[in-house]
């Protein structure tokens, strides 16, 4: 830098392009500056020159201050021309502040759309990050997180288990391998086989699993990446997609899609497809999608991976649905996708898909329905006469894509989901192609290259084995159990209440307001001691059970209601006891901490 001489400085009123560019390069040599900031800085220079050329000077204005910091040799601390070396730091600081202001401009403009809770969360996240940067405070925070981490490890890592960290020199005997695995699996299968797990295992009957395992074994070595070797796997995938599309009112509409590894990949693919569609057809390079706060976290992951701005709208605190009026206010020229859930994972409520699709259609953007949880439940519930609050699938004009998990209520093996699109032209944007590769033409429809053909074959076998009537009968039983649980919580169990108006198989409950409040996570912990594994939720603090086919077995729902009633009564009694100490084990302290902190810091510090 000492050998760099800036170009001579002409009068401010008569700048030249070589002078401007030369001075900018000399002052920023060796540094990297975002292109847009550099362009804006040059624009400031010429706007300032134009304004001063013949009329009103900009003395004292923000524009002049920025211009002086960036170009004229003045710094934040002195108002006279100095050498390059003495102004380099000041000028870099000025440009950095300018760039940070530009980066924050969008967030600042969005504040007017945010609720007080969202503003408080954002402020809390920023404050927590600043405080955590202080060494003394950072040490205290890390100490507390270390305590919780050790508790989680103790809960998940059972003592006495042999841990293998290197490949054994000599292989084990076949029987020894199977015996060892059978021992561990036997200990872990008991809980879900008794129907005491929320979600997780959706069918589980031995006869059904036997057929799926047989189908998988036949295609255990197959790979859909090589359709010339295993053309039957390609056939199975096409038929699974077609049957799923038909179930969701897309059979005669040209709806198409593919099989992915799960709901998260289906969602990532849908976002990626709409991003590419918007970029190629509408020229959008800074895309945004609009989701509810109850939308699955896979949309957060998709936006982080794909560099898409996520506009998250707080769901209605009573209905837990996405408000279409709020969506309208958040639309912009960069909106590429609106997302609705049918149902959402936390409270099991269904967003107003028809209203959201109309907004998307008028705005010219995509509309994705996340039906990962309800894809093989809602169509049959509708057929059975249950009120779902409106249509939710490709029967709604404006819906451009859907995600539907076959490994949930499609009762297939874990690792399969279906992503569907309104047309082949839209699906085309999902594909990745690279014809210039030296290894030959490379084209993959999903994120993965190689996929397990055995899983696709097992999915096809599941759908063919159950048939339409089999799925309908399963949904009839599931909806009956869910309805019983909802009615019992609403009418008979005092101390808790339903969240929203769940229309399908997810039932969430929170605690009633009372002089001495109950911790809902204490109820969850008490249920865990009785062998139940429920899902703890937050914002608001609540718990849900996702009813599956296993819960329809004789006596399961009766046991659940009896245990839940007993645990709620015990939690109320503990809350009313002034001498009772709060629990230090289980989910209660962990989620209590989560509720008191903004979302970002906990995610970044506790779980990474």
How should each PLM-predicted stretch be described?
Residues 2-234, 238-242, 246, 472, ...:
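Non-catalytic terminal extensions of PLP-dependent enzymes
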Residues 229-233, 257-264, 291-293, 500, ...:
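Active-site nucleophile and cofactor-binding loops and adjacent substrate-binding regions
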Residues 237, 241-242, 254-284, 297-302:
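Conserved beta-loop-alpha segment that forms the PLP phosphate-binding cup at the N-terminus of a helix
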Residues 278-333:
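PLP-dependent aminotransferase-like
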Residues 320-369:
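Active-site phosphate-binding strand-loop segment of PLP-dependent enzymes
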Residues 324-328, 350-362, 374-401:
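Active-site pre-lysine segment of PLP-dependent enzymes
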Residues 380-516, 597-600:
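Active-site C-terminal subdomain of aminotransferase-like
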